[in-house]
Amino acid sequence: MPAALVENSQVICEVWASNLEEEMRKIREIVLSYSYIAMDTEFPGVVVRPIGEFRSSIDYQYQLLRCNVDLLKIIQLGLTFTNEKGEYPSGINTWQFNFKFNLTEDMYSQDSIDLLANSGLQFQKHEEEGIDTLHFAELLMTSGVVLCDNVKWLSFHSGYDFGYMVKLLTDSRLPEEEHEFFHILNLFFPSIYDVKYLMKSCKNLKGGLQEVADQLDLQRIGRQHQAGSDSLLTGMAFFRMKELFFEDSIDDAKYCGRLYGLGTGVAQKQNEDVDSAQEKMSILAIINNMQQ
């Protein structure tokens, strides 16, 4: 069915605390055949700036991300599932997870909250019926979505998105050093393609997600600045770009694991000879130390 003819309620499932476990059961089945996952988050903006001396502007960008992710809470997560051809499962293909968030108690940027409210987010419902992040993390760990080498993650300018995901999965602050962040990221998300990073090799493509979608003649389903709709559009953009600019083959050595705007951004194993079990054990030790 053409995207323009699809109602968002037919393909995007709203997930709250009441239906979380039921929908995660469906995802455990879906990911077996649809292992390309486009992801987007909504979060309450940027509220602080790091102070002190920084090794470089790139180091500053990571410290900016780190201090804000540590202070703030994720509001929404969108996950869209496709196969390697960009084909969707029949029916629902996108899940929009709505997390607990309290405008009275939690920190936020007013401009960001106004934007999200104008985009249709229901903050009263987030407070009363939102998902507990710890419960979600427990279910995600055993979902077949993270910690799996065969799952490919698609994102757009996603440093903050993955920052919030690492915080959620580790239940701890982000590591002080960017290279430690990428080690942990690689454990949970072994294969990441950031569409904004891919755009560096796509002549004339520029701007944010909606601008890119317009240039690629893609039809949005749902509302902009909602995580489900944005994740769905991110997946569409990836597969259209892969076809138009990369001859349906993306060079992993050049693009996989690179996040736009963060350092070298390589979330890949440094040495293919390193035993992966030992690598994962060392990363888990880092996480354990962070939680203590």
Swiss-Prot record:
Parts forming coiled coils: none
Localization of this protein: Cytoplasm; Nucleus
Binding positions for a divalent metal cation 1 per the UniProt entry: D40, D161
InterPro entries: CNOT7/CNOT8/Pop2, RNase_CAF1, RNaseH-like_sf, RNaseH_sf
EC number: 3.1.13.4
Effect of D40A: Impairs deadenylation and decay of mRNAi-targeted mRNA
Subunit comment: Component of the CCR4-NOT complex; distinct complexes seem to exist that differ in the participation of probably mutually exclusive catalytic subunits; the complex contains two deadenylase subunits, CNOT6 or CNOT6L, and CNOT7 or CNOT8. In the complex interacts directly with CNOT1. Interacts with BTG1, BTG2 and TOB1. Interacts with BTG4.
Record function comment: Has 3'-5' poly(A) exoribonuclease activity for synthetic poly(A) RNA substrate. Its function seems to be partially redundant with that of CNOT7. Catalytic component of the CCR4-NOT complex which is linked to various cellular processes including bulk mRNA degradation, miRNA-mediated repression, translational repression during translational initiation and general transcription regulation. During miRNA-mediated repression the complex also seems to act as translational repressor during translational initiation. Additional complex functions may be a consequence of its influence on mRNA expression.
Family assignment from sequence similarity: Belongs to the CAF1 family.
Name this protein carries in UniProt: CCR4-NOT transcription complex subunit 8
